[in-house]
């Protein structure tokens, strides 16, 4: 897709009345905005500046090469630019199957070949144009008007001789026979017109000709009824300029299913076509219409490509590559299409093209990542500046206060938050941006990983190492998965030393990433490095525990605003994930020790687990050690619980607790709990909430919790994890405070 599509080298600020300029700027930022393109085209057509119109249409058609051709050609026809028109027809007709475009083409041919002045030669050219058009789009259910145009043209011919009259009759009958077997929208009306015409030509032979086509007509009429039922009379043939992800009204999904029903109907061959190639032609035609109507749905392009490959992979290979390249112009961030095209290039042994396809996707994703990162930095920098201004204002006010107010100021200091406050709107936006950033990070990591694997397959380990180096240089935030996959690739290429070094390199960046530690532990177990396993376990466990402790301490700050509570909720989820990683790490090491270690060490691990997670059921760790690959006998037979050992463990699952206290949900992130909140829950939640005390946390307790010191004040580092017993002891030893 071309960059700098509209921006000039000496670009000036747009005037507020410069609608065209503003639209061009918007399209420079988002070249795939179909609606803005249409507005721009309307604006330039109204201005009627030829060079500007041509420039906009050419840029538009480089992206949407299936749309707006009729509009552009009509503009040139109105100006009498017939040479331009012919060039446009030569560009669009080979790549676009559109009924109205073909009708416009025939209309142009008739305009430039007058049968009155041109005679038989002109008539022959027009007939050829009609034949081209009906061959190209005559099977379309909406092609009835084109066929009728053809018939009307033939019927308007006034023969000069008897043999010409017979030739005219034969031509008309031949067109009718082709027309009547195609299930067009007004097929019954066409049949009625045909039977009337046959009787007018020759009543004695009419029944014979009508009987020959009645069976095929009945099939076509029946198909027409089935088609309307399958598409529920709501199929949209015009462009729907949205994709799956912004399909708020479920329009794309609904239309997609209707197109699939049409394709399924064609596969059933209810028209009883004897030639398989005719069935394939109809299916192909429907796919072409579908991708024109839903151009931003990668799934459709993918299935159309697979259809061509199944039909004749060797013959259609080049067509498939062209199709996927067109699809990626409209869906440049599609993983599905990128991976499919790169595989085709790899199979075709054009490796440079395959890597270029990956690089294009990485470029788009990296730009998105950087844009989101800039937005996050902009919000945080703005809030930091606001905080500094507030602090400066506060210092000025303090200098004006009397010394007698010092005690009151000391009391207020205890309520100050060491971090800046975010507005509700900014906090929500920041949370969404961070989620999107994390998602893009994983996506970029995955694409680099697949590129590395493709290079390993096609060019060997040396080329894959080049990708490993390139990715770390180009995208510093690349995820741990990339290191793990590269290390395993080296290992399976008989490079154990290199694999170990890559894991060691990964430890420098991801020592607090539980998923990386688990993968590294699996690797060490696989290569049977006993001492290294123990060292990694202790290092990883220590790093994760420290990280969790820091998060717990940070969470004890002032969270009086709903905005900060949103951020706190996000951090809490992340903290739960880290705790789950700690559990997995201990369980994995415990299972390893149960096979290759000794019982004393296993018991020591049990004690440490219970110390770190005192609220967890002690049976959980014990039963995990004795579960099989496909069955957990303790959980299933002794505890009577559902056996989930064969299922993948959800790393985001909540912690398993001996008892769970369900606090009522607070909709507006305030400390007060309203009885009205239960109205917004489902029946199950309502029953659960009714069982809990109302107003569980009031303002008094909430304000007390705000000013409590963090966990680091309650003892040595080993006690930094929250201990509810010590909190109860603290409350019990508080002196009685007289109330007024």
Swiss-Prot record:
GO cellular component: cytoplasm; nucleus
Localization per record: Nucleus; Cytoplasm
InterPro entries tied to this protein: HAT (IPR003107), Rna14-like (IPR045243), Suf (IPR008847), TPR-like_helical_dom_sf (IPR011990)
Keyword flag Disulfide bond: no
Swiss-Prot/TrEMBL GO biological process terms: mRNA 3'-end processing
Stretches forming HAT repeats: 48-78, 80-114, 121-156, 167-200, 236-268, 278-310, 494-526
Bias kind Acidic residues: ranges: 392-413
Bias (Polar residues): 672-688
GO MF, one example: mRNA binding
Lineage: superkingdom: Eukaryota
Keywords: Cytoplasm, mRNA processing, Nucleus, Repeat
Region annotation (Disordered) ranges: 381-418, 668-688
Function: Component of the cleavage factor IA (CFIA) complex, which is involved in the endonucleolytic cleavage during polyadenylation-dependent pre-mRNA 3'-end formation.
Protein name, entry field: mRNA 3'-end-processing protein RNA14
Gene source species: Debaryomyces hansenii (strain ATCC 36239 / CBS 767 / BCRC 21394 / JCM 1990 / NBRC 0083 / IGC 2968)
Gene: RNA14
């Amino acid at each position: 897709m071309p960059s700098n599509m509209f921006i000039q080298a000496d670009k000036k600020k747009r005037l507020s009345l410069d609608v065209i300029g503003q639209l061009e700027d918007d399209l420079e930022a988002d070249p795939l905005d179909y609606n803005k393109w249409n507005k721009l085209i309307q604006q330039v057509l109204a201005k009627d500046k030829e060079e500007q119109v041509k420039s906009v249409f050419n840029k538009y058609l480089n992206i949407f090469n299936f749309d707006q051709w009729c509009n552009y050609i009509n503009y040139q026809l109105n100006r009498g630019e017939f040479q331009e028109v012919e060039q446009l027809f030569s560009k669009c007709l080979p790549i676009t199957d559109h009924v109205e475009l073909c009708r416009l083409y025939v209309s142009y041919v008739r305009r430039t070949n007058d049968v009155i002045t041109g005679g038989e030669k002109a008539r022959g050219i027009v007939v050829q144009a009609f034949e081209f058009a009906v061959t190209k789009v005559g099977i379309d259910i909406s092609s009835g008007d084109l066929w009728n145009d053809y018939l009307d043209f033939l019927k308007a011919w006034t023969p000069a001789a008897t043999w010409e009259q017979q030739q005219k009759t034969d031509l008309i009958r031949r067109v009718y026979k082709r027309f009547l077997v195609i299930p067009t929208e007004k097929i019954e009306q066409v049949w009625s017109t045909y039977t009337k015409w046959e009787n007018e030509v020759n009543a004695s032979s009419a029944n014979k000709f009508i009987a020959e086509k009645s069976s095929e007509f009945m099939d076509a009429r029946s198909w027409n009824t089935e088609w309307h039922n399958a598409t529920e009379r709501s199929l949209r043939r015009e462009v729907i300029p949205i994709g799956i992800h912004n399909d708020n009204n479920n329009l794309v999904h609904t239309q997609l299913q209707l197109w699939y029903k049409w394709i399924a109907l064609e596969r059933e061959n209810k028209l009883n076509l004897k030639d398989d190639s005719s069935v394939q032609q109809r299916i192909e035609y429907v796919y072409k219409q579908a991708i024109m109507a839903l151009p931003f749905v990668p799934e459709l392009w993918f299935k159309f490509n697979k259809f061509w490959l199944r039909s004749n992979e060797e013959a259609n290979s080049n067509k498939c590559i062209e199709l996927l390249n067109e699809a990626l112009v409209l869906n440049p961030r599609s993983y599905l299409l990128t991976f499919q095209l790169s595989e085709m290039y790899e199979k075709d042994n054009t490796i440079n093209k395959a890597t270029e396809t990956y690089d294009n996707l990485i470029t788009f994703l990296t730009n998105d990542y950087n844009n989101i990162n800039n937005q996050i930095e902009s919000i945080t920098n703005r809030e930091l500046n606001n905080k500094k201004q507030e602090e400066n204002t506060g210092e000025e006010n303090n200098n004006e206060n009397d010394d007698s107010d010092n005690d009151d100021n000391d009391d207020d200091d205890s309520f100050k938050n060491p971090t800046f406050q975010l507005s509700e709107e900014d906090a929500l936006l920041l949370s969404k941006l961070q989620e999107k950033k994390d998602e893009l990070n994983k996506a970029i990591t995955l694409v680099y990983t697949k590129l590395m694997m493709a290079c390993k397959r096609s060019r060997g380990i040396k080329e894959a190492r080049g990708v490993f180096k390139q990715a770390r240089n180009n995208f510093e935030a690349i995820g741990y998965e990339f290191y793990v996959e590269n290390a395993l690739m080296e290992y399976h290429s008989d490079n154990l030393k290199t694999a170990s070094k890559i894991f060691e390199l990964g430890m420098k960046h991801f020592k607090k990433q539980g998923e990386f530690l688990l993968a590294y532990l699996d690797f060490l177990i696989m290569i049977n490095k006993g001492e290294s396993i123990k060292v990694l376990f202790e290092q990883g466990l220590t790093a994760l525990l420290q990280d969790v402790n820091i998060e717990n301490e940070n969470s004890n700050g002032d969270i009086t605003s709903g905005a900060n509570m949103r951020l706190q909720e996000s951090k809490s989820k992340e903290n739960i994930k880290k705790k789950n990683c700690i559990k997995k790490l201990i369980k994995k090491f415990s299972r390893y020790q149960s096979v290759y270690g000794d019982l004393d060490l296993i018991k020591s691990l049990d004690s440490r687990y219970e110390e770190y997670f005192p609220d967890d059921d002690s049976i959980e760790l014990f039963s995990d050690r004795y579960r099989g690959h496909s069955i957990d006998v303790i959980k299933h037979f002794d505890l009577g619980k559902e056996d989930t050992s064969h299922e993948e463990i959800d790393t985001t699952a909540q912690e398993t607790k001996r008892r769970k206290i369900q606090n009522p949900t607070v909709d507006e992130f305030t400390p007060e709990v309203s009885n009205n909140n239960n109205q917004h829950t489902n029946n199950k939640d309502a029953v659960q909430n009714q069982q809990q005390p109302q107003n569980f946390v009031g303002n008094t307790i909430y304000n007390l919790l705000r000013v409590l010191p963090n966990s680091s004040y309650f003892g040595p580092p080993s006690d930094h994890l929250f201990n509810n017993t010590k909190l109860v002891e603290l409350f019990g030893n508080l002196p009685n405070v007289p109330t007024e």
